[in-house]
Amino acid sequence: NGERGRAATGLVVAKGSFAAMGGAERDLMRNLPALARRFAVSVATLHPVPELEALCSELGISLISPEKPWEPPTGALSAVLDAGMDSASRAWARCSGLHDAISDSDVVHLVSGDGSLALLEHVPESMAVHLHLLEPHRGLHEDVLHRKVDGSPKRNLGLTSALLSRARRRDIEFIRGLTDRPRSAISGNSSYTAGRIGEVYGIEAGVLMPSVVADEFPVGASSDEPASVGDMSGPYVVSVGRASWVKGTWETISMLAGSGLSLVHVGGGNDGDLARLLDYAESCDVGLWVAPHLSSLEMASLMRGARAVVSMARGEPFGLTPIEAFSVGTPALFVDE
């Protein structure tokens, strides 16, 4: 940071993709200003978004990414062959300036997600690396992502697990291989996640909690905050996260039946799942509005106007959402498994 005449420590902050712009991405972005004051920061990603580009420009931070944003391969065969890891590694290799940024830096702070772990193939063994492992790969180590939005299996779960054995082994090898490096550390985002990391990978992990900037979700609405968001005509609750069985979206609608409360769903989902949810909500006489991508100001307004922020998610720590809800004075009702 230049204090006492010393050169700032070089830090590469990396995440495979920011496309989702969910809690993990928002958490990392809200920490960049503080990191930039302490370190000489470069940001690397295979899929930037306009919000990240604007922030890096404002902070004077170098943003490294491929010319064409990377998308993880889709389809059952890609999952079985673990094609995403190889595809991401090739995309990292195509990032102009990445090699120089790593060579000129002292530390890599890597946040897990699609495409992230493949960066380790381009980081020297001797370099200090901190991995913020937000959760063990749930598609490989659990069956919750292999169920439809209503909980029914997408295909035979035993066969799915067997077909993913190669990808599962490779995931474990990557994580354990990182711990074998002489200058490495792994943190979960909660004590729950740290425990799961121990169960899945057989290693110890620290805890790096998520953070909220008070100005982003203030107790009182700022002049820039919209008075309302969406077209909800009556009382509503908010759920956050991509519509899926693991997020408990289906059960949230069931819970609201007969309550007179509508549901605002933030986080999107695939078209088929959203159509099924809309049909199910109609059958339960529950109003459902699927919100588009929202800014922090819009999220604050939406939460502020809600009766509660709710979640029926399976096997997840509470994360950022309840902290954001509490910050604006709205109750957060989350299932405790």
Please state what every model-predicted region is:
Residues 45-50, 240, 261-277, 292:
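Glycosyltransferase donor-sugar binding loop
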Residues 275-297:
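Nucleotide-activated donor-binding/catalytic signature segment of Leloir-type glycosyltransferases, i.e.
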Residues 293, 301-306:
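Short alpha-helical donor nucleotide-sugar binding micro-motif in glycosyltransferases
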Residues 2, 195, 199-200, 212-234:
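Acidic anion/phosphate-binding donor-loop and adjacent secondary structure
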